Regions:
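Active-site metal-binding core of divalent-cation-utilizing nuclease and nuclease-like domains
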Residues: 106-136
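Metal-dependent nuclease catalytic cores that hydrolyze phosphodiester bonds in DNA/RNA
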Residues: 1-107
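Hydrophobic, Leu/Ile/Phe/Ala-enriched alpha-helical segments that form helix-helix packing faces
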Residues: 90-98, 167-178, 216-220
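Nucleic-acid nuclease catalytic cores
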Residues: 135-201
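Well-ordered, non-membrane alpha-helical segments in soluble/globular domains
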Residues: 86-89, 160-170, 203-213
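Short, charged/polar micro-motifs that form catalytic or ligand-binding hotspots
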Residues: 34-38, 76, 80-83, 117-122, ...
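Short N-terminal helix-initiation segments at or just after the protein's N-terminus
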Residues: 68-79, 126-132, 207-211
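Domain-level recognition of nuclease-like catalytic cores that cleave nucleotide substrates
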Residues: 182-227
Length: 227
């Protein structure tokens, strides 16, 4: 059996899931991820990342891309619907732009195939920020940004704080970046146009995450995560 693993966004959802059955389903889905789900919002993710990397100035260009995606009828029904969903996501993200402050940083994207994560209580948590924020003078990494897209499972503000906290700890402790600013650790819940930053204090939240990962590992190996 594969070792227990979970994406950081799903861990954030798990932390605030309202029912045991929802937590059970999250673990089950991580055991057998669906390829078509992982492929969703590809156009939106690429467009938003490019927009941030270029300095977040060309909003009209981003909206024009959303319009083209919405009008395109090429490919399968899934491809058409996914482009429409990506267009919706882009238009929603535009509403959140003013809450993202790059400060003295430049935004740097990472290849989508790059594996980035950490072990917490025996569970591999895939962190994979969409953007790193690097000080344009010193070159030091000061923060990161992670996007969350699904309309059906938006991150609550509490869940997003857990995601931002774990991302901050990953950069500081796993990568050894000593200049990380919690105010530059962003989580954007795209469908709700909500922007959350990591809280200043993180020890208690990381303890909560550790306990949750212990629970995930138990579900993973006991078979209780099965749908």
């Amino acid at each position: 059996m594969q070792d227990p693993r979970i994406s950081l966004n799903k861990l954030g959802e798990y932390m605030t899931a309202p029912t045991p059955s929802r937590r059970k389903r999250i673990v089950s889905d991580q055991q057998a991820p669906q390829t078509f789900i992982a492929a969703r919002y590809k156009d939106a993710r690429e467009a938003i990342v490019d927009f941030i990397v270029s300095g977040m100035s060309d909003r009209s260009g981003l909206l024009s891309l959303a319009s083209r995606l919405r009008k395109s009828r090429d490919g399968s029904e899934f491809a058409i619907n996914d482009r429409i969903a990506s267009a919706d996501a882009i238009e929603s993200f535009i509403q959140a732009v003013d809450d993202i402050d790059l400060g003295n940083c430049i935004a740097v994207s990472m290849p989508g195939t790059t594996s980035q994560g950490m072990k917490i209580a025996g569970v591999y948590v895939s962190v994979r920020p969409d953007i790193y924020l690097r000080n344009w003078v010193t070159g030091e990494i000061e923060g990161a940004l992670k996007l969350h897209f699904p309309k059906t499972s938006p991150l609550t503000s509490a869940g997003a704080e857990y995601v931002a906290t774990a991302m901050r700890v990953y950069m500081e402790l796993e990568q050894g970046n000593s200049h990380v600013d919690h105010r530059r650790c962003y989580v954007v819940d795209v469908p709700t146009a909500s922007v959350t930053v990591a809280p200043k204090a993180y020890v208690r939240k990381m303890k909560d995450i550790e306990v949750a990962c212990e629970e995930i590992a138990i579900r993973w190996f006991s078979g209780s995560a099965a749908a």
